UniProtKB/Swiss-Prot annotation:
PROSITE patterns listed in its UniProt record: ARGE_DAPE_CPG2_1 (PS00758), ARGE_DAPE_CPG2_2 (PS00759)
UniProtKB keywords: Amino-acid biosynthesis, Arginine biosynthesis, Cobalt, Cytoplasm, Hydrolase, Metal-binding, Zinc
Subcellular location: Cytoplasm
Underlying gene: argE
Reaction catalysed by this enzyme: N(2)-acetyl-L-ornithine + H2O = L-ornithine + acetate
Entry-linked Gene3D superfamilies: 3.30.70.360, Zn peptidases (3.40.630.10)
Taxonomic lineage from the root: Bacteria, Pseudomonadati, Pseudomonadota, Gammaproteobacteria, Vibrionales
Protein name: Acetylornithine deacetylase
EC class (word): hydrolase
Binding site for Zn(2+) 1: 76, 108, 165
Cellular component GO terms, alphabetical: cytoplasm
Length: 378
């Protein structure tokens, strides 16, 4: 049987739409792309299991080899939506131009599975001593559903994991988490000619925002990690809306904010700090404040700095590991084994019109993955 080429696999991935979104009109599921991945890896000799996590949402686990431990290569199979008017190319067609692959998912990150596929074909597997696993997850771009489900129900425990997000082939050993909430203040509307007729939600929100800015200062003062370019947690007040007319007492005001906690800050601890910051406002205005999560919180992540896995991958890549401020599935997979984030392409291309991957990454990525497979499986 003739196996598909690297280019054919890449084209097949990009042409198979797998958008995930919190907007139901965009959300598609990933069944079709998982079906293709399962078929390709079966043809390579992997045993493959497809798990339906939710209707239309699937994970794929492929395994080559027997025994314990081994290496897990992981990534998400979904993409973000796209703004067609801002693209110069068809997002669902792999376009080659100016030594680049253009298309939705070329860098972030369906294309990574084509690199795994090609690297596997170059290995002499007769010398294999430990298993190689490939994990393709669902809904990374929205809820991290696939990674959460896999971690909670993992059928094996690898020695190490590499997640192929676009890092320009620089190993990433840590990143901040992400917590995003809405604070809704419910007042009582009324005619502005008599303030006593109502309770102004904007005025209460003013007190909330003062408390949140005090919390921001506390986070900066109490937490510091020298391994990050921005060494403290960040708290951003990102969106606010309240009221509907200048001559009405505002009956409702809502503030959206996010926090990017450092590794080591527990989500429960952060929640307690938030509640503590708002305690006085809530006591003054009982029943008028509500905190609503905008998505499931993601903790910070860090692979132990002196772990041999970091040194081994740094040697393969011939570059030092770093930390970043964006989020991946690493906090969940790190619960199973030491995990690094390492993949082709630049994070600057993620979620952008005319997303692309430079041809300069093709041979080095296949080489890095091949060497990792040999080092940790053979």
């Amino acid at each position: 049987m003739q196996l598909p080429s690297f280019l054919e696999v890449y084209e097949g991935l990009i042409s198979t739409s797998s958008i995930s979104s919190t907007d139901p009109s965009w959300d598609q599921g990933n069944a079709k792309v998982i079906e293709k991945l399962a078929s390709w890896f079966k043809d390579l000799g992997f045993s493959v299991e497809v798990i339906e996590v939710e209707p239309g949402k699937h994970n794929m686990i492929a395994r080559m080899g027997e025994g314990e431990g081994g290496l897990l290569l992981a990534g998400h199979s979904d993409t973000v939506p796209f703004d067609e008017g801002r693209w110069s190319f068809d997002p669902h067609k792999l376009t080659e131009k100016d030594n680049r692959f253009y298309g939705l998912g070329t860098a972030d990150m369906k294309g990574f599975f084509a690199f795994i596929y090609e690297a596997v074909k170059k290995i002499d597997w007769s010398k294999q001593t430990k298993p190689l696993y490939v994990l393709a997850t669902c809904d990374e771009e929205t809820t991290m559903l696939g990674a959460r489900h896999f971690t909670e129900n993992a059928p094996f425990k690898p020695d190490y994991c590499i997640i192929g997000e676009p890092t320009s082939l620089v190993p990433i050993r840590g990143h901040k988490g992400h917590v995003a909430n809405a604070i809704r203040v419910t007042g009582k509307s009324g005619h502005s000619s008599d303030p006593a007729l109502g309770v102004n939600a904007i005025e209460i929100m003013h007190e909330v925002m003062f408390a949140m800015m005090q919390l921001r200062d506390k986070l900066v003062k109490e937490y510091h990690h020298p391994g990050f370019a921005i060494p403290s947690p960040t708290l951003n007040l990102g969106h606010i809306h309240g009221g509907d007319s200048a001559n009405r007492i505002c009956g409702c005001c809502e503030l959206h904010y996010d926090v990017r906690p450092l590794p080591g800050i527990s989500l429960d601890g952060l929640e307690n700090m938030l509640r503590g910051a708002l305690k006085e406002v809530e006591a003054k205005w009982p029943g008028r404040l509500e905190i609503i999560p905008l998505h499931d919180p993601i903790p910070g992540y860090e692979c132990q700095h002196d772990h041999p896995f970091i040194g081994g991958v740094e040697e393969i890549c011939q570059t030092s590991s770093e930390t970043v401020n964006y989020c991946t599935e690493a906090p969940f997979l790190q619960q199973l084994c030491p995990t690094l984030v390492l993949g082709p392409g630049s994070i600057d291309q993620a979620h952008q019109p005319d997303e692309f991957l430079s041809f300069d990454f093709i041979d080095p990525t296949i080489d890095v993955l091949s060497r990792a497979m040999v080092k940790y499986c053979c």
